Regions:
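Bacterial N-terminal signal peptides
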Residues: 1-5
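Compact beta-sheet-dominated domain cores in extracellular/mature segments
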Residues: 6, 13-221
Length: 221
């Protein structure tokens, strides 16, 4: 669940932009459960996403227990997620079953200025219940990165910094915010509403000029 940092309260002391930025980043970082390099399992071997990137993988998922698995295809990811759900059911690291009225989230087929999804695999905007999913390219194409655990994610740790061009939020509750880290000023954010997608971040204006495509340094959910 996203909790927005830096909310103003009555009587709060006035701070400069740099101090405000540092305070907000510290508050968000307090929600980070992971430390150190991100080590993933891919084709039965360990790979260091932080130091060495994805290799030939096209799809990586961080599960609630913070383990990361990478895959070549989306059907492999779906099978691994089903196995994880079965193994972790009833534990603190379980993936919750969707309640009545909720399910996997699927965006609609591509039209100008709208969300888009084409087919399963590349171009799919399907996002499992309880997850937030990022894509490398617009309209849900390219490498995809999925998160189930709430908190702040330094996308550089996953070799995904400045690489997000579309996002879907199907978390259990709350929004999902992408942040761009700035020096000496508050970090801009763009929020994806609960049970929603932004299929083309290049179409959203960025506060300091340009657009939001390939700008995100951090995800908070």
């Amino acid at each position: 669940m996203l909790a927005l940092a830096g909310a103003q309260t009555a009587g709060a002391a006035t701070v400069g932009p740099a101090a405000e930025q540092a305070q907000e980043q510290a508050e968000r970082a307090a929600g980070t459960a992971r430390s150190g390099d991100v080590i993933a399992t891919y084709k039965g071997k360990k790979i260091n996403l932080t130091a060495n990137g994805w290799g030939t993988a096209g799809n990586c998922t961080e599960f609630p227990d913070l383990t990361v698995q990478c895959f070549d295809r989306e059907d492999e990811e779906k099978a691994a997620t089903a196995s994880y759900k079965k193994a972790k059911k009833g534990t603190k690291d379980a993936i919750a079953d969707a309640p009545a009225g909720r399910s996997d989230l699927t965006a609609q087929s591509a039209t100008a200025g709208a969300m888009a999804v084409q087919v399963d695999g590349d171009g799919s905007g399907c996002t499992p219940y309880g997850a937030v999913r990022l894509w490398e390219h617009t309209w849900y194409y390219g490498r995809q990165l999925t998160f189930y655990s709430d908190g702040s994610k330094n996308l550089g740790d996953y070799t995904f910094r400045d690489q997000t061009s579309s996002i879907c939020n199907n978390d259990e509750s709350g929004g999902a915010a992408l942040y761009d880290w700035r020096t000496g000023m508050p970090d801009p954010q763009i929020i994806t509403g609960w049970v929603g997608c932004l299929g083309n971040l290049h179409s959203y204006s960025y506060p300091y000029g340009g657009d939001w495509g390939d700008k995100a340094d951090e995800l908070t959910m």
